């Protein structure tokens, strides 16, 4: 069993992402599994080394330790997406050569079947079903050869051997796309778990309008066990 978190160093660690990290860490530890931390920094314009350092420091402040990934290493080379662009391009071109994707104004789009269903069992929500007629062809490699989130995340989860993907339910609508990519790469599907979002007192998704929601702010005001 292997779980992961994949924060993007485009800002400080959000409390919602910290909750997701804690869930993955606890589930891995409770089941003698492996917990991996990778850095999703394909957004090279907004990603900074300062934010990456801040995220790592705050994960450690939360008491989390990881078995594989950034800083601790492992058997899969780099754990930063910005150093794996060649790998993503290789996969995109393979899908293109197999007529599972096509070029569109310099970009590469994944070809979604016209009909059918994508079904999977979610650890929290139970059986999920998506009609492919509601899913449009989607970009996997941009015209500048940078990967989209869908491609980079799926390739990494395959290459690193992730068996359970636990993340926020705001990503739920992307899961059918990821399942199609896993199948296109002839990969075994991981299990999925979509965690409920955190909400503020006004019943809306927790965001900066509710005040500072970064862990960096929290650890200045609360002890770790809080």
What kind of feature is each model-predicted range?
Residues 1-107, 132-133, 173-187, 204:
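N-terminal Rossmann-like or analogous alpha/beta NTP/dinucleotide-binding catalytic cores
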Residues 6-8, 195, 222:
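Hydrophobic alpha-helix-in-membranes signature
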Residues 41, 112-114, 224:
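Non-catalytic surface loops within mature trypsin-like serine protease
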Residues 42, 197-199, 222:
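Hydrophobic pocket-lining residues within nucleotide cofactor-binding pockets
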Residues 81, 94-217:
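Active-site cores that bind ATP or allylic diphosphates and position pyrophosphate for catalysis
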Residues 219-226:
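Single conserved hydrophobic/aromatic residue that forms the stacking wall/gate
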